[in-house]
Regions:
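Short acidic-hydrophobic, aromatic-tinged amphipathic segments that line or gate anion-handling sites
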Residues: 1-6, 75-80, 170-180
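Boundary-proximal intrinsically disordered activation/regulatory segments immediately upstream
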Residues: 1-63, 151-153
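Amphipathic alpha-helical repeat scaffolds
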Residues: 35, 126-132, 243-248
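Short, aromatic/basic amphipathic alpha-helical patches
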Residues: 62-73, 224-225
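Glycine/small-residue-rich loop that forms an oxyanion/phosphate-binding "nest" at active or ligand-binding sites
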Residues: 69, 73-99
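Structured adenosyl-cofactor binding patch, chiefly the S-adenosyl-L-methionine
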Residues: 98, 136-140, 151-168, 223-259
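RNA substrate-binding interface of SAM-dependent RNA methyltransferases
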Residues: 104-196
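Active-site/ligand-binding-proximal alpha/beta "capping" segment
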Residues: 191-241
Length: 259
């Protein structure tokens, strides 16, 4: 068991969750996922990010064993509670911390089926929104989540935590420009959620291959609207002026996959 607070393992983890973690995660191709839920999904997944090293406290090991999870195939290191606290980005660690390898999804391999539904996040900055949208996309059966350059790092601790394990269920493609998406799929229907949209979401029926575009929380996506991008709005009967981005995205995804 590792008990020293000077262990190089702590430094290895801290650099991946630090304020400069985006750069480090990209260079090392690794990210941190904490908690039983993420460990369960990663150990069970046949695709997506794989666990490289699993750090456990004694209580964390009990949780893993109690959940019936088989961690024999990954490097497992026992650490003390103080060491886990030093590694963790949460106030109350669960005693389970996974160092995972970032999945290598190739955008070139993404195909259309005639009824494909994608989500495109344009310069989204809030990690909670990004993670929640990915989680909702998983729940609604969306086929892929695509992010633009300048969007929040989808492998940051806060985003990973907000996905609640859905990161292992849905293909993720990061750093893809809208023009690249359009060039690859020229026939795909592009919808942009906007308060100024003239088309009601409820008017959309059988859109076939479709990508729903959600923009920056503060600036929106008005600059993207035009050409072959259809601006849509969510009709609201109440008095609220607007919806939280993740709530609005969930409504759009539900309609697109249910209609």
């Amino acid at each position: 068991m590792i008990e020293s607070l000077h262990s190089p393992h702590i430094a290895r983890v801290k650099v991946l969750i630090s304020s400069r973690g985006n750069k480090e995660r990209g260079e090392h191709g690794q990210f941190i996922a904490e908690g039983l839920q993420c460990a369960r999904e990663a150990l069970a997944a046949t695709s997506g990010p794989k666990i490289k090293t699993l750090f456990l406290t004694e209580s964390g090991l009990s949780r893993i064993e109690g959940a019936g999870l088989d961690s024999a195939s990954v490097e497992t290191i026992l650490v003390s509670e103080p060491v886990m606290a030093a590694m963790s980005s949460t106030i109350t660690p669960q005693g389970i911390l996974s160092v995972c390898e970032i999945g290598q999804n190739s955008f070139a391999d993404l195909k259309l089926t005639g009824k494909s539904k994608f989500i495109y996040l344009h310069e989204i900055q809030d990690p909670g929104n990004a993670g929640t949208i990915l989680r909702s996309a998983d729940a609604m059966g969306i086929d892929a989540v695509i992010t633009s350059p300048g969007s929040v790092d989808m492998y940051s601790p806060k985003v990973v935590r907000a996905t609640a394990g859905s990161l292992w269920h849905i293909p993720l493609y990061s750093g893809i420009t809208l023009s690249t998406l359009s060039e690859k799929f020229p026939s795909i229907t592009k919808l942009a959620l906007s308060a100024q949209g003239r088309t009601s979401l409820l008017e959309l029926k059988d859109v076939g291959d479709c990508v729903a575009i959600f923009g920056n929380e503060a600036r929106g996506i008005d600059t993207l609207i035009g050409g072959d991008v259809v601006a849509v709005n969510i009709p609201m009967k109440g008095n609220a002026e607007s919806l939280n981005l993740s709530a609005a995205a969930a409504i759009v995804m539900f309609h697109l996959t249910a209609s």
